[in-house]
């Protein structure tokens, strides 16, 4: 059975989708943008480092609502507006995800919603 996740402190989705869902032992966190807690139509201040920290914080909150932590993440997908930002993203990512690190995909995209620099989704197992 599938259940929707709506974590407190995570801004409402900017489209018709859940912040995340659970299906059995799996937890799926929807792509998170570095949006403001006060306004889901506005990005936080800062560059790629701050935006990466924000999306991981949001993912962490969604996972916590489902009883998971970042160490339960099995796979992530990062969407970057500029692949040249990957080194900065990797620095934040390495600090937040423990070994063994999740499997990961990185995709450069032509544009992200709200002109964000990064978006991330993940799959975790509880």
Regions from the language model: what does each represent?
Residues 2-126:
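Short, polar/acidic, helix-capping and beta-turn segments at strand->helix junctions
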């Amino acid at each position: 059975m599938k259940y929707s996740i709506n974590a407190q402190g995570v801004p409402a989705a900017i489209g018709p989708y859940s912040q995340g869902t659970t299906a059995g032992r799996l937890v799926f966190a929807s792509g998170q943008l570095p949006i403001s807690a006060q306004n889901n139509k506005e990005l936080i201040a800062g560059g790629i480092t701050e935006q990466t920290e924000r999306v991981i914080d949001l993912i962490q909150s969604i996972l916590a609502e489902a009883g998971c932590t970042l160490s339960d993440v099995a796979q992530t997908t990062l969407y970057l507006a500029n692949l040249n930002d990957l080194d900065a993203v990797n620095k934040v990512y390495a600090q937040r995800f423990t070994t063994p690190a999740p499997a990961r995909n990185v995709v450069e995209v032509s544009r992200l919603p709200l002109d964000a620099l990064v978006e991330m989704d993940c799959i975790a197992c509880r």
